[in-house]
Amino acid sequence: MEQLQNLIRDALKAIDGATDTQALDALRVQYLGKKGVLTEQLKALGKLPPEERPAAGQAINRAKETVNEALSARLEALSAAEQEARLALESVDVTLPGRRQAVGGLHPVTRTIERITDLLGQLGFQVAEGPEVEDDYHNFEALNIPAHHPARAMHDTFYFDANRLLRTHTSPVQVRVMEQGRPPFRVIAPGRVYRCDSDLTHSPMFHQVEGLLVDEGVTFAHLRGVLDAFLQAFFEQSELKTRFRPSYFPFTEPSAEVDIQCVHCGGDGCRVCSHTGWLEVMGCGMVHPNVFAHVGIDSERYTGFAFGLGVERMAMLRYGVNDLRLFFENDVRFLRQFA
């Protein structure tokens, strides 16, 4: 029995000196495992005289309970200490500034399209849409663009086959609108267009907004009035000066390029306007009689005007962006400025 007491004393001392749960588990195996010291003591009971076995068995079982209770108590203490140490390492400094909730925002191109459609909507224009994969007739022929026109060249247009292509402008939407209805028309067609071009100011895919107004008695003066009102509202300059330069487009006659006084230097001349004081923003003109003929509208009774502008170009001018490619590179540092 004295040997058993010494065994218990040594076990309790070892348990009390265990510094982590792994060492404690090793002690459990050493004393209470299948081949543990106390387990072997129980197995040796058969060697004792019969009259000594009950008392010895009870003493060994009490020893096992004592060791087991000591193991449980020490395990609880070590677990609490480990948790406290872990919490100390993971503590939160409540004096640090909090992390703001990330807030998204519309892409600058989307914002610009919405601004354009909203302003032209206030002038009575309704949004119309059409397919991005177009046929040759609606993209070219119906718009008075003959087969020999440079715009039909492979290096300017993405073709699927001889008759199918990615639309090079949103003007085909105007043709489809006029095919499906009767005047008067007052529509705008925002959307993606595609051309074989890529540099600082051009992209293979970009966005356009085309406008069309057809009615009786429509003149170039109406066109100028609409565009002046729109541009002044878009750039938020009530005294914004515009000029219309003669130009050529197959689907309008007469045609013009629209310039605005540079919104960056006020017309004094700067790097943005190449020191001319003017910025080109869109093309326009009166709808060509041949276009009316393709859609069955009497050009003797009805007249109309059309205009088209590049959304990215307008966004660059409005937000002071000097590289078109920034709109498509998905750089969060750039896009976050518009959130």
Curated annotation (Swiss-Prot):
Its main location: cytoplasm. It is found in: Cytoplasm. Disulfide bonds: none annotated. It catalyses: tRNA(Phe) + L-phenylalanine + ATP = L-phenylalanyl-tRNA(Phe) + AMP + diphosphate + H(+). GO terms for molecular function: ATP binding; magnesium ion binding; phenylalanine-tRNA ligase activity; tRNA binding. The keyword S-adenosyl-L-methionine does not apply. It comes from the Bacteria. The keyword Ion transport does not apply. Pfam families: Phe_tRNA-synt_N, tRNA-synt_2d. GO terms for biological process: phenylalanyl-tRNA aminoacylation. GO terms for cellular component: cytoplasm. InterPro entries: aa-tRNA-synth_II, aa-tRNA-synth_II/BPL/LPL, Phe-tRNA-synth_IIc_asu, Phe-tRNA_ligase_II_N, Phe_tRNA_ligase_alpha1_bac, Phenylalanyl-tRNA_Synthase, tRNA-bd_arm. Its EC number is 6.1.1.20. Binds 2 magnesium ions per tetramer. Keywords: Aminoacyl-tRNA synthetase, ATP-binding, Cytoplasm, Ligase, Magnesium, Metal-binding, Nucleotide-binding, Protein biosynthesis. NCBIfam families: pheS. PANTHER family: PHENYLALANINE--TRNA LIGASE, MITOCHONDRIAL, PHENYLALANYL-TRNA SYNTHETASE. Belongs to the class-II aminoacyl-tRNA synthetase family. Phe-tRNA synthetase alpha subunit type 1 subfamily. Tetramer of two alpha and two beta subunits. This is Phenylalanine--tRNA ligase alpha subunit. The gene is pheS.
